[in-house]
């Protein structure tokens, strides 16, 4: 059966743009006739070899229903005849399934990529080619599969119907059915049937293809689809400008199109796509681009504008000039070549393309000239360059070096020896040979001359007053020269005629001299030690997983998070200031150079006419013709615009400017101004930025002190240790000199230390068999104390038969666990008990050795063991291996030998190990008095403002002192050691109950005071509470209760209280001055020097010290000093291989512990009020933390505009104030006002004059 195309009822009607119906077949399969089949039946199709049949249905009887399209031989208008009928499928073969088949390449990712079918919508107009153009484009292109063409009838304007053949893969129409010869060997399932895969698979992609290597923009080209779409967009844009008769826009679009084609060429070279199909297609693409570029220029130059306008406006293509038709035909071929290139690359649709546009490497953007220490942690500290870590790894991989982790990637300076003797980070020999071929040997940053200031300076500048003084001193030296330069500029402005050129050169020379003098300031800014802020960021990370030995609770995490948010904007401003410092210096140099030029605009032609980012790719949302001006016109108009200059124009320059305009001269929008004004303004900016640098260094120093001050006042020594970890000079302690201590406070007085020199001299006179064997392995300090020694030497000195060093013995027994395990320590003592006699002794010498050394040493061993078990034993010292020592048997042997104290030793051993009594000799007492009723009396609480104000400040301070001193007395030396050692030496220490309770009480008191104030809605009552607590703190000071006093001060300077402007206004100045004096006493400057002086003057008075200072001293002494000493021989200049115990570190710990114990001995003679004490204890429970209190503070006084500072000289005010004290808008505007005038090439725009 047959029918005309217009009456084909089995097709789905589709209308074109002009409303004409286009019958479109929807076959379920396409088959090719392989054998001839003739039939006379009208419901069956006769087939010839090569016919394409479009299958509509597949019958169950073995016959298929299909459509065969042929030209009508009897009709002059070449109408189409559609034959539909049944045909036998055995005479055909399906080609649709082969087209969509997926080759088995053994890789799941490649299978997914090969089966991906993205439909490109590259052009709004269809691409229609003649057979000649199609064959010309596809000549020498090997298609591994035959292309499937769908015949599509299309109505023409004259009412005729034209048949076009459409290929969906190439998205192209052809006027004649193309036929391309197929290869003889079928390679559908062969790996090489996909040229892109065959060339790339198995090879390493270029290093620029790594998705984690660069900071990418949203508009960057990443995939093949994006690239093809972007290029086609510029083709469409160029074609539209051609038809619009806009020559300037056409040239701009053509320039952008040429840049994108260049990117395509570079991309194919980077991917090493050397397949002939790619090379030939790309060559044809470039040739076609050159062809229509030449023809288009001929079109614009040879044809008048009006004629071009008339020709381009013709809707009938036949009425256009042949040249224009040829150009448009070339555009059609260009579109098809792009589709063909995309079709050949289609199997790699998800492959990430190499980065072609310049982008910053990740972890490397440190502004222009400055290092960013917040990114340096990712770099190897031993590297001689600051190359990005990802870049180093990528280049190493491209050089044949495989590193499983970043630590295996070495980097050494050019020409530096890599032998194992000089560096323990040297690579292996095979790696050295490979590395010679990498790019690192030619990296400029790897040379000694181009190293940064950071790499040249070994130690950073600490954040302290000394560093600030260096900056200020350098600035004062620069100010004198700068003022003279400003004076010269003013003289030029007042007397331009007599201003010589020589003076210009002199000012230029002084500018360079001034800038060179700025290097020390740049050195300080570049090398400030920001370790504490780096640690704060790490600790404030919510995703951070802490080690087991790091104890950080929820309250500590809340404090860290709050501190990080409060300090982040200060650090951001600091780095902005560094960048503006760079901008001002650069501008200062440029302006000074202008002074020596006859024509200050002589370098203007060197400026690029194109704006920044002119050739940047466009965003996907902009790739349509409606938004085409975003790239072509918008970028040129908006990006080139610069702000007006704020300098006053020179009158003579204005006259010249207007004359040039009147003469129609090209002035290129240049601004004529007086250079002296510019130079003077640059000097002013330079002067201001120097002051600004001092201000920011001072702010960083204050914020560091405030952060440590708050952590110390809250007794968060673990936080302090983590914040200062890695900081230069952290915890340093000069072991050579012992801190001066009051004789009254010295608990363990050693009256014999002054005679140590004479005693050591007497040892030399003894016979050799009576001398100490390990005396040469002891290191003595200048204070006649043991500074260090080997384990054998320390044990020998501990059990010495002639010398009893009481302080050494106590220090050893308290801190022995940091040197030995319990089993090891007792084993050494047992070995010392069973001393072997020296060799070659006669009978008399042996008897003398037994009498004068062996027996006294045995007595000393038994005495030391007894003292250890009786006074210094701690349940955490127990170990499973202790049973192997048979201590009870050892004691019984000592009893049989009649050793003094052996009976008591056996008693202590049995008590500690056999009877299971593992209680500590100094067991802690209960927190409260035993007579206090254990039943909680909840009726009386300080829960209201009236109840708190009703209590007399003296009574409250007295009972608070009694309560806190009782808790302080429960602190043991083992609590302190547990706090600083944690699990460092043993995991059986557990918690520190006494110390934890004392710290918890102080922090609860702080929260109670601050919460009592913020929950009160009435301003006058809040002011009374402030005054009331200040008076309580003052009485606590009079009672030497520094712990409670510090807790109250910390509460009043907390973020939720400090910001209450209206409340502080209601407090009288005398009371605020009283608070200021209390805060000055606890000033953390110089390691709490004011508080330490006050504490030292107390002598025998009762006191509750502020424990935060002790915790800091213990933490810094333990963490900041090594456990071992390494001696260096002066003659050889090499280190001794033996390790000596740093006993001086242990002595310093005991010095601090003895001061803690001292204040437990003197008690207060106050009368205890049980009701008040119980009310205080119960009121401290269930108090909200800092965040909840701050929310209440915002409710009672929202958004204060300015702050009334209760203590203007307090150093902890900026840490305690909240991050919301300054609104975000305020911060932003402040930063803009401060730094806007330092922007290079841009100044503030003057307000335009509005004419009425």
Swiss-Prot record:
Note: Suppresses the CDC25-5 mutation in yeast (restores cAMP level) and has similar functions as CDC25.
Protein name in UniProt: Guanine nucleotide exchange factor SDC25
GO cellular component: plasma membrane
Pfam family, one: RasGEF
Ranges of Basic residues composition bias in the record: 1239-1252
Gene source species: Saccharomyces cerevisiae (strain YJM789)
Keyword Cell cycle (UniProt): yes
Region (Disordered): 409-454, 623-648, 1201-1252
Record keywords: Cell cycle, Cell division, Guanine-nucleotide releasing factor, SH3 domain
Keyword Protein transport: no
């Amino acid at each position: 059966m047959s029918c005309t195309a217009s009456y084909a009822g089995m097709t789905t009607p589709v209308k074109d743009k002009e409303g004409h119906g286009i019958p479109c077949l929807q076959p379920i399969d396409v088959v090719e006739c392989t054998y001839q089949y003739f039939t006379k039946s009208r419901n069956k199709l006769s087939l010839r070899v090569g016919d394409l049949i479009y299958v509509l249905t597949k019958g169950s009887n073995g016959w298929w229903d299909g459509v065969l399209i042929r030209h009508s031989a009897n009709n002059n208008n070449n109408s189409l005849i559609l034959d539909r009928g049944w045909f036998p499928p055995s005479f055909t073969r399906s080609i649709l399934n082969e087209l969509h088949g997926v080759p088995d390449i053994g890789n799941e990712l490649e299978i997914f990529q090969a089966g991906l079918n993205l439909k490109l919508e590259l052009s709004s107009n269809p691409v229609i080619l003649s057979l000649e153009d199609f064959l010309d484009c596809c000549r020498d292109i090997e298609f591994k599969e035959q292309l499937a063409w769908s015949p599509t009838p299309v109505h023409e304007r004259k009412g005729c119907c034209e048949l076009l053949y459409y290929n969906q893969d190439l998205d192209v129409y052809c006027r004649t059915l193309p036929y391309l010869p197929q290869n003889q060997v079928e390679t559908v399932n062969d790996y090489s049937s996909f040229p892109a895969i065959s060339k790339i698979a198995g090879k390493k992609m270029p290093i620029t293809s790594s998705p984690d290597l660069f900071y990418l923009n949203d508009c960057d080209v990443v995939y093949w689809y994006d690239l093809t779409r972007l290029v086609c967009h510029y083709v469409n844009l160029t074609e539209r400008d051609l038809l619009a008769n806009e020559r300037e826009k056409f040239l701009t679009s053509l320039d952008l199109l040429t840049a994108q084609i260049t990117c395509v060429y570079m991309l194919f070279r980077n991917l090493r796509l050397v397949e002939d199909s790619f090379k030939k297609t790309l060559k044809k693409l470039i040739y076609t681009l050159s062809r229509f570029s030449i023809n288009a220029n001929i079109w614009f130059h040879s044809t008048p504008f009006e004629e071009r306008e008339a020709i381009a406006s013709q809707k009938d293509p036949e009425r256009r000039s042949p040249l224009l038709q040829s150009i448009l035909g070339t555009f059609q071929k260009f579109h098809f070549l792009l589709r063909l290139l995309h079709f050949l690359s289609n199997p790699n649709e998800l492959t990430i393309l190499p980065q072609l546009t310049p982008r910053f490497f990740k972890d490397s953007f440190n502004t222009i000239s400055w290092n960013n220490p917040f990114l340096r942690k990712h770099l190897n500290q031993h590297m001689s360059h600051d190359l990005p870590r990802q870049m180093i790894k990528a280049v190493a991989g491209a050089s044949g070096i495989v590193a499983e982790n970043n630590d295996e990637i070495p980097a050494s300076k050019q020409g530096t020896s890599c032998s194992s003797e000089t560096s323990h980070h040297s690579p292996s020999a095979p790696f050295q040979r490979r590395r010679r071929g990498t790019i690192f040997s030619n990296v400029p940053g790897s040379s000694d001359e181009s190293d940064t200031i950071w790499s040249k300076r070994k130690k950073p500048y600490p954040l302290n007053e000394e560093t600030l003084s260096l900056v200020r001193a350098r600035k004062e030296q620069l100010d004198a020269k700068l003022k003279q330069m400003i004076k010269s500029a003013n003289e030029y402005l007042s007397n331009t005629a007599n201003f010589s050129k020589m003076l210009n050169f002199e000012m230029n020379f002084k500018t360079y001299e001034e800038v060179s003098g700025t290097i020390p300031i740049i050195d300080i800014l570049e090398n400030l030690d920001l370790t504490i802020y780096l640690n704060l960021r790490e600790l404030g990370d919510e995703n951070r997983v802490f080690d087991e030995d790091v104890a950080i609770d929820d309250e500590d995490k809340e404090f860290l998070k709050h501190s990080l948010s409060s300090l982040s904007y200060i650090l951001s401003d600091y780095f902005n200031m560094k960048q503006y410092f760079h901008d001002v210096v650069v501008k200062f140099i440029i302006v000074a150079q202008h002074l020596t030029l006859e024509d200050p605009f002589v370098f203007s032609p060197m400026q690029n006419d194109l704006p920044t980012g002119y050739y940047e790719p466009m965003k996907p949302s902009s790739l349509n013709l409606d938004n085409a001006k975003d790239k072509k016109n918008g970028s040129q108009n908006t990006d080139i615009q610069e702000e007006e200059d704020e300098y006053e124009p020179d009158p003579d320059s204005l006259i010249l400017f207007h004359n040039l305009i009147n003469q129609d001269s090209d002035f290129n929008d240049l601004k004529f101004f007086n250079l002296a004004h510019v130079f003077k303004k640059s000097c002013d900016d330079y002067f201001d930025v120097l002051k600004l640098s001092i201000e920011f260094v001072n702010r960083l120093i204050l914020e560091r002190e405030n952060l440590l001050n708050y952590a110390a006042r809250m007794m968060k020594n673990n936080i302090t240790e983590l914040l200062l970890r890695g900081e230069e000079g952290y915890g340093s302690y000069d072991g050579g000199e012992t801190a001066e201590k009051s004789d009254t406070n010295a608990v363990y007085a050693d009256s014999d230390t002054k005679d140590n020199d004479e005693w050591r001299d007497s040892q030399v006179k003894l016979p050799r068999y009576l001398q100490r064997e390990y005396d040469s392995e002891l290191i003595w300090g200048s204070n006649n104390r043991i500074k260090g020694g080997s384990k054998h030497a320390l044990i020998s000195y501990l059990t010495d038969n002639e010398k009893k060093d009481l302080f050494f013995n106590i220090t050893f027994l308290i801190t022995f666990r940091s040197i030995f395990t319990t089993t090891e320590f007792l084993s050494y003592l047992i070995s010392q008990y069973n001393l072997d006699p020296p060799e070659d002794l006669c009978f008399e010498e042996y008897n003398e050795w037994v009498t004068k050394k062996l027996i006294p040493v045995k007595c000393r061993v038994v005495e030391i063991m007894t003292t250890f078990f009786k006074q210094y034993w701690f349940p955490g010292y127990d170990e499973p291996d202790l049973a192997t020592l048979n201590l009870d048997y050892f004691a019984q042997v000592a009893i049989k030998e009649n050793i003094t104290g052996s009976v008591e030793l056996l008693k202590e051993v049995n008590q500690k190990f056999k009877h299971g009594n593992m209680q500590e000799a100094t067991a802690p007492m209960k927190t409260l008095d035993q007579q206090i009723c254990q039943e909680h009396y909840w009726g009386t609480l300080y829960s209201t403002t009236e109840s708190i104000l009703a209590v007399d400040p003296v009574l409250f301070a007295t009972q608070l002192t009694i309560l806190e001193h009782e808790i302080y007395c429960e602190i043991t030396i083992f609590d302190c050691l547990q706090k600083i050692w944690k699990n460092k030496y043993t995991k059986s220490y557990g918690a520190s109950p006494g110390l934890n309770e004392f710290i918890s009480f102080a922090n609860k008191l702080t929260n109670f005071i601050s919460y009592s104030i913020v929950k009160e809605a009435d301003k006058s009552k809040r002011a009374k509470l402030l005054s009331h607590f200040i008076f309580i703190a003052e009485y606590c000071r009079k009672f030497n209760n520094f712990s409670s006093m510090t807790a109250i001060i910390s509460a009043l300077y907390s973020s939720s209280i400090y910001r209450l402007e209206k409340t502080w206004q209601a407090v009288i100045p005398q009371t605020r001055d009283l608070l200021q004096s209390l805060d000055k006493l606890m000033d953390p400057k110089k390691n709490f020097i004011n508080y330490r002086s006050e504490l030292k003057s107390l002598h025998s008075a009762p006191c509750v010290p502020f424990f935060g200072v002790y915790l800091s001293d213990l933490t810094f002494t333990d963490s900041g000093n090594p456990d071992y000493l390494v001696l260096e021989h002066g003659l050889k200049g090499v280190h001794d291989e033996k390790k000596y115990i740093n006993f001086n570190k242990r002595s310093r710990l005991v010095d601090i512990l003895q001061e803690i114990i001292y204040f437990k001995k003197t008690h207060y003679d106050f009368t205890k009020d049980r009701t008040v004490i119980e009310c205080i204890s119960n009121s401290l429970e269930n108090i909200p933390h800092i965040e909840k209190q701050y929310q209440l503070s915002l409710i009672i006084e929202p958004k204060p505009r300015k702050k009334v500072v209760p203590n203007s000289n307090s150093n902890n005010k900026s840490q305690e104030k909240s991050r919301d004290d300054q609104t975000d808008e305020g911060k932003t505007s402040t930063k803009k006002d401060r730094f806007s005038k330092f922007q290079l090439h841009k100044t503030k725009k003057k307000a335009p004059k509005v004419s009425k």
